[in-house]
């Protein structure tokens, strides 16, 4: 929120809505700050897929946000665009650990450019779309970089928490021209991921291969 306040100060801008991808801890738990104990917000539009909506309505303390009208739920439908000013946002399903809700990514189309946002997904081979073709058809592709490589979590079976390793994503996209690889931005890094360190050898390797590593404060012009 500090970064957001710096980039879009609340004296000039208001929060016009929040889109949620799925019901995993890092993607919805911040909603609680809209509640009476903190912001006490008024009817902030909350864009949710059907299963995600059911999760919010059926479980406290999130259900209280609806009851007290801190948020106002707007239901999303898969592959159906929502028009917001000059931006169209379209949710699409991606395979993930859907214990509590479906999981979506978002296509975000502005007047001149299109961004793809996929913070969480299982292995790319499980998706019914070609990541290579998605990159070719987009201007910015922000993808899951939770873990850099296998073995990053000592003592854990990483197949139980599936994500595409950064090394796997780079290998999959390695045959793209250098310019096309520059559309790809790695996001959603776990605290164990060496890409968080801008000076790490892994960060330098990724950049040398033509890919980008998202940092706080980055802007994407649509």
Task: Kindly give the residue locations of the regions a language model identified.
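Active-site metal-binding motif and surrounding structural segment of the metallo-beta-lactamase
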Residues: 1-47, 139
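Short, glycine/charged-enriched secondary-structure capping and boundary segments
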Residues: 6-9, 32-36, 60-62, 104-105, ...
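Structural beta-sheet core signal
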Residues: 18, 46-48, 116-117, 186
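A short helix-to-beta-strand connector/capping loop
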Residues: 42, 66-72, 85-87, 207-210
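A short, active-site helix/loop in glycosyltransferases that binds the activated sugar's phosphate group
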Residues: 51-61
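Cap/insert and terminal regions of metallo-dependent hydrolase folds
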Residues: 114, 122-219
């Amino acid at each position: 929120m500090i970064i957001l306040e710096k980039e879009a100060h609340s004296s000039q801008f208001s929060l016009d809505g929040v889109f949620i991808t799925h019901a995993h801890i890092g993607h919805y738990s911040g909603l609680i700050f809209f509640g009476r104990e903190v912001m006490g917000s008024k009817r902030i539009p909350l864009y949710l897929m059907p299963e995600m909506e059911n999760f919010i309505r059926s479980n406290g303390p999130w259900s209280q946000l609806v009851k007290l009208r801190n948020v106002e739920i707007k239901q999303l439908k898969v592959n159906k665009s929502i028009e917001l000013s000059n931006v169209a946002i379209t949710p699409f399903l991606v395979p993930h650990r859907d214990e509590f809700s479906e999981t979506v990514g978002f296509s975000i189309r502005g007047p001149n450019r299109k961004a793809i946002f996929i913070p969480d997904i299982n292995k790319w081979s499980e998706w019914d779309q070609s990541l290579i073709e998605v990159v070719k058809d987009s201007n910015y592709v922000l993808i899951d970089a939770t873990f850099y490589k296998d073995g990053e979590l000592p003592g854990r079976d990483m197949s139980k928490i599936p994500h595409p390793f950064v090394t796997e994503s780079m290998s999959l996209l390695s045959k793209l021209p250098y310019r096309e690889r520059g559309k790809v931005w790695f996001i959603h890094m776990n605290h164990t991921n060496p890409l968080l360190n801008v000076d790490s050898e892994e960060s330098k390797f990724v950049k040398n291969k033509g890919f980008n590593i998202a940092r706080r404060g980055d802007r994407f012009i649509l």
